[in-house]
Amino acid sequence: MEIKIIEKKENPLLNRTEIKFECEYPTEGTPTILDVKHKLVALEDSSNDLLVVDSMKPSYGVPTAFGLAKIYDSTESLAKIETKSVIAKNEEPEEEPEEEAEDAE
């Protein structure tokens, strides 16, 4: 998966940077939002808690998707501005502790 940043715009009113990107994935299926988020965090040298992938739209018949990501200045700004659904789809899944199965003999 390769991500190209198309446009990067500062939005001082909302304390964030908006990034329009193109994601190419020629040998695999459409990546998940979390995969794209991790790649953008690495590219932008940002914190995982401050970046959200708002939308990602795959192109029909082409292994390419276009999307919008936002990097906030603080977690307070992110919580105040973003909708709960966007925050939920950008959260890491919780790891469930593995319980050992006991044999009932």
Curated annotation (Swiss-Prot):
GO molecular function: structural constituent of ribosome
UniProt keyword terms in alphabetical order: Ribonucleoprotein, Ribosomal protein
Xref: SUPFAM superfamilies: Ribosomal proteins S24e, L23 and L15e
Region entry Disordered, spans: 85-105
Segments of skewed composition (Acidic residues): 92-105
Cellular component GO terms held in the UniProt record: ribonucleoprotein complex; ribosome
Domain of life according to the entry: Archaea
Pfam families tied to this protein: Ribosomal_S24e
Gene3D superfamilies named in the record: 3.30.70.330
GO biological process: translation
Family per record: Belongs to the eukaryotic ribosomal protein eS24 family.
Protein name: Small ribosomal subunit protein eS24
